[in-house]
């Protein structure tokens, strides 16, 4: 393991969707000569702009961003892919004398970057396709029979992790939880300042509702319509994410727009709650109130970088 003094210093900014991570990250980057490394699993996809709440064109112009718009919607992107790409981006940023700020709410990606990945078998696309039409509740039920520990941590909407856990068990006869227990998750590959934004729950839910309404005003329905017209099917991981799957169902005549919006708000709130739970279990996190005292936050960052 590298000596602490020789490790690259990396700032990680996490928190639930709608907490203001992107805004804070841009402000910090401008102050410290930073560049942002995206750690949101959906913002890597081109054409998925409104529903993923990508940084605005103005913010992208203010500060360099990495790992945004790097894939087409029909391409797979795993935690392993993220770790490889983010590691390369951070090395490039450091080489140019800048500071990397990793920003996002996909906890699995952040953990993969900092601690590495569980040594489990590589993916099997053919095997995964067998689960494509299985409802989330049924995936969770099946997983609970063979890996109750992992099942207890997952939600029926978390199809990617449910399918991956079933895939690993099918391939090896061992639950993912067994592989996880063999990984200490203690060898941090960077010198890290981990920060996360804490928002009172009702305030967060209020922000989420407003954010969803703004997505509709900004053209989310048309964005999904164009994706479908371009040949990207509802079975794709990207179009099964929150916001896209509900609007796809609306466009297919399976629900009204009001019903779709209600589901988007509900599922986004549930996702934000799971994100808060995940970050709450992480060690050594510096919790922020934002909007709050930017000067205090900046001071903490500068002290870390000194």
Curated annotation (Swiss-Prot):
Superkingdom per UniProt: Bacteria
GO molecular function: ATP binding; tRNA dimethylallyltransferase activity
One family name in Pfam for this protein: IPPT
Keyword Membrane part of the UniProt annotation: no
Transmembrane segments: none
Annotated Gene3D superfamilies: 1.10.20.140, P-loop containing nucleotide triphosphate hydrolases
Catalyses which reaction(s): adenosine(37) in tRNA + dimethylallyl diphosphate = N(6)-dimethylallyladenosine(37) in tRNA + diphosphate
Keywords attached to this entry: ATP-binding, Magnesium, Nucleotide-binding, Transferase, tRNA processing
Functional summary from the UniProt entry: Catalyzes the transfer of a dimethylallyl group onto the adenine at position 37 in tRNAs that read codons beginning with uridine, leading to the formation of N6-(dimethylallyl)adenosine (i(6)A).
Protein name: tRNA dimethylallyltransferase 1
């Amino acid at each position: 393991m590298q000596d602490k003094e020789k490790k690259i210093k990396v700032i990680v900014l996490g928190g639930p969707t709608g907490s203001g991570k992107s805004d804070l990250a841009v402000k910090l980057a401008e102050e410290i000569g930073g560049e942002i490394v995206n750690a949101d699993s959906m913002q890597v996809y081109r054409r998925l702009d409104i529903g993923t709440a990508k940084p605005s064109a103005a913010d992208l112009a203010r500060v360099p961003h990495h790992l945004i718009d790097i894939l087409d919607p029909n391409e797979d992107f795993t935690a392993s892919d993220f770790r490889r790409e983010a590691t390369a981006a951070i090395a490039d940023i450091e080489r140019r004398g800048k500071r990397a700020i990793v920003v996002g709410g996909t906890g699995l990606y952040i953990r993969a970057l900092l601690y590495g990945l569980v040594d489990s078998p590589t993916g099997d696309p053919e095997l995964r396709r067998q689960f494509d039409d299985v409802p989330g509740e049924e995936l969770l039920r099946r997983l609970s029979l063979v890996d109750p520990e992992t099942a207890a941590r997952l939600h029926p909407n978390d199809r990617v992790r449910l399918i991956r856990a079933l895939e690993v068990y099918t391939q090896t006869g061992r639950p993912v939880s067994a592989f996880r227990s063999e990984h200490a998750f203690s060898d941090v590959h960077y010198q890290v300042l981990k920060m996360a934004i804490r928002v009172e729950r009702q305030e967060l839910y209020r922000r989420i509702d407003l954010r969803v309404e703004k997505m509709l005003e900004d053209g989310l329905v048309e964005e999904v319509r164009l994706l479908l017209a371009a040949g990207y099917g509802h079975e794709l991981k990207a179009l099964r994410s929150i916001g896209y799957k509900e609007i796809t169902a609306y466009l297919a005549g399976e629900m009204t727009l009001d019903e779709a919006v209600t589901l988007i708000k509900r599922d986004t709130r549930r996702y934000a709650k799971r994100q808060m739970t995940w970050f709450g279990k992480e060690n050594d996190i510096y919790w922020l109130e934002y909007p709050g005292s930017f000067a205090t936050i900046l001071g903490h960052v500068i002290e870390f970088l000194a």
